[in-house]
From Swiss-Prot:
It holds the Pfam family Ank_2. This is CAP-Gly domain-containing linker protein 3. It is found in: Cell membrane; Cytoplasm; Golgi apparatus, Golgi stack. A lipid is attached at residues 534-535 (S-palmitoyl cysteine). The keyword Cell inner membrane does not apply. ANK repeats lie at residues 117-155, 160-189, 197-226. Residues 400-409 have a biased composition (Polar residues). GO terms for molecular function: ganglioside binding; microtubule binding; microtubule plus-end binding. Palmitoylation by ZDHHC17 regulates association with the plasma membrane. The N-terminal half is dispensable for proper Golgi targeting, whereas the GoLD region is required. Keywords: ANK repeat, Cell membrane, Cytoplasm, Golgi apparatus, Lipoprotein, Membrane, Palmitate, Phosphoprotein, Repeat.
């Protein structure tokens, strides 16, 4: 029977694989902490998170005395407590067991759902085990309490079509995987999720490089030979180390270990071919260099950005394939020529960097009166390797780089230059004043001077100045959030009339939004956006209600 969702925005229809659930009853308007627990689950309408009067922060802090007064107040409703749980901040997620217990005390059924995200308390508990933001111990305590009360492990969120085990695998919480599978039916461990190409929890762990969760799933009988909708086994969805950026040596090491683990777990009787990822382990390093017209000791350009001296070429212990080791001119590297206790070459600390062979080209010093242009050199075809985004150092204008494979791909992907007029998040118009790495967040960021005072700063963040603009005219955004709307300009243009939408961008491991879209658009896209929607939309909704 189809469930009627009383929430303002109903989630999309359930997938074919979702288990049948009991029909929900209408939500009581004012549940009491002393009320007896209902016999059937309901869907609670969305509500804003309560905050103390004149509170200095925009999020709820259960450690604050004023917030504790609200948390333990019998008049605080279940929808309001669900709104608190949705806040993706450590202060809230570390207290998931305390908040969850308060929800249960108010007569909440163990399988009740949050009307905004269609998630149950067990879903939230599994999400709260995420390392860095959540607390696995608190998440396990609440999960054990919910399971003892009869929580259904097979229930799925209709936004993501994920059950509790999928969330635990996605956020790499092995302790929760063990708790969930302890008394679950055998088919739960191999239950699939349509948002991950109908892959199992093991597929989800493999694609997210969750080594701990993958090991735990295999220990509990997960099928390593199960194929998803694309015909891939879990080992085949592990990200390829050759596609990773220059400074992802640790992630490459995890990918190699995880892929080996999953390959070896495939039964010998199963006629499955080994995973066919690009592998150049048997190609001598000198042949690779000869194909590039290089030799050890040559000056090289790394990804069209960093210059250094080629010190190593060959196979490594941290990832499959051929890698080059470069001693950089500046201390912008990651090591001293050794990774994981294995030394490949010697250089000063922070000046060693490893990269795939396709990301280097021979560097040629330019004549004083001409523009640098590196001659073309023979290159091997690495069709699966893509170059990193461009980088511009603070305080310096970037000179034209050599037409290497990486730099050509950078130009194709480039969105805007310094001085270009852009549209930020589809709403705010401004001029690019900065592009490069920052101290406040990893990756490459655009610094934009907005036409209107709707920004956050004057070009400086945490005492570090990246560009100069009037107060509240500065804002930073990743490349995915901007759109070039004109050529280079020195003065701001007229602002484009657009409806103002208050937005808070929340960060989770390995996941970002691309543009501002309606909830319907977000729900219809890939699993990453739909999963993060559960955390992001409540913040935007709360900002709208306050305005």
């Amino acid at each position: 029977m189809t469930k009627t969702d009383p929430a303002p925005m109903a989630p999309p229809p359930r997938g074919e694989e979702e288990e049948e659930e009991e029909e929900d009853e209408p939500v009581p308007e004012a549940p009491s902490p002393t009320q007896e627990r209902r016999q059937k689950p309901v869907v609670h309408p969305s509500a804003p998170a309560p905050l103390p009067k004149d509170y200095a922060f925009t999020f709820f802090d259960p450690n604050d005395p004023a917030c504790q007064e609200i948390l333990f107040d019998p008049q605080t409703t279940i929808p309001e407590l669900f709104a608190i749980v949705r806040q993706w901040v450590p202060q809230v997620q570390h207290k998931i067991d305390v908040i969850g217990n308060e929800i249960l005390r108010r007569g909440c059924h163990v399988n009740d759902r949050d009307g905004l995200t269609d998630m149950t308390l067990l879903h939230y508990a599994c999400k709260a085990g995420a390392h860095g933001v959540g607390d696995p111990a608190a998440a396990v305590r609440l999960s054990q309490q919910l399971l003892a009360l009869g929580a259904d492990v097979t229930l799925r969120s209709r936004w993501t079509n994920m059950n509790a085990l999928h969330y635990a695998a996605y956020f790499d919480v092995p302790d929760l995987v063990r708790v969930l599978l302890k008394g679950a039916r055998p088919r739960v461990v191999n239950s699939t999720c349509s948002d991950f190409n109908h892959g199992s929890a093991l597929h989800i762990a493999a694609s997210s490089l969750c080594l701990g969760a993958a090991k735990c799933l295999l220990e509990h009988g997960a099928n390593p030979a199960l194929r998803n909708r694309k015909g891939q086994v879990p080992a085949e969805v592990v990200p390829d180390p050759m596609d990773m950026s220059l400074d992802k040596a640790e992630a490459a090491l995890v990918a190699k270990e995880l892929r080996t683990l999953l390959e070896e777990a495939v039964p010998l009787s199963c006629a499955l071919p080994k995973v066919t990822l690009p592998n150049y382990d048997n190609v001598p390093g000198n042949l690779m260099l000869s194909a590039l017209g290089l030799r050890l000791g040559d000056r090289v350009l790394l990804d069209g950005q960093k210059t250094g001296t080629l010190r190593f070429c060959g196979t490594t212990e941290f990832a499959s394939g051929q890698w080059v080791g470069v001693e950089l001119d500046e201390p912008e590297g990651k090591n001293d020529g050794s990774v994981g206790g294995v030394r490949y070459f010697i250089c000063p600390p922070k000046q060693g960097l490893f990269a795939s062979v396709s990301k280097i080209s021979k560097a040629v010093d330019a004549p004083p009166s001409s523009v640098t242009s590196t001659p073309r050199t023979p290159r091997m075809d690495f069709s699966r390797v893509t170059g990193k985004g461009r980088r511009e150092h603070k305080g310096k204008k970037k000179t034209p780089s050599s037409p290497s494979l990486g730099s050509l791909q950078q130009r194709d992907r480039a969105k805007a230059e310094v001085g270009d007029q852009v549209l930020v998040a589809g709403q705010k118009q401004g001029i690019v004043r900065f592009y490069g790495k920052t101290d406040f967040a990893p990756g490459y960021w655009y610094g934009i001077e907005l036409d209107q005072p709707t920004g956050k700063h004057d070009g400086s963040v945490f005492g570090v100045r990246y560009f100069t603009c009037p107060p509240r005219h500065g804002v930073f955004a990743p490349a995915s959030r901007i759109q070039r709307i004109g050529g280079s300009t020195d003065s701001p243009g007229d602002s484009v009339g657009a409806k103002k939408v208050h937005q808070v961008t929340m960060t989770q491991p390995k996941r970002t939004f691309t543009t501002v879209r309606t909830p319907k658009d977000i729900a219809s896209e890939n699993s990453i956006s739909r999963l993060l929607f559960c955390c992001w939309f409540p913040w935007m909704l709360r900002a709208e209600m306050q305005s």
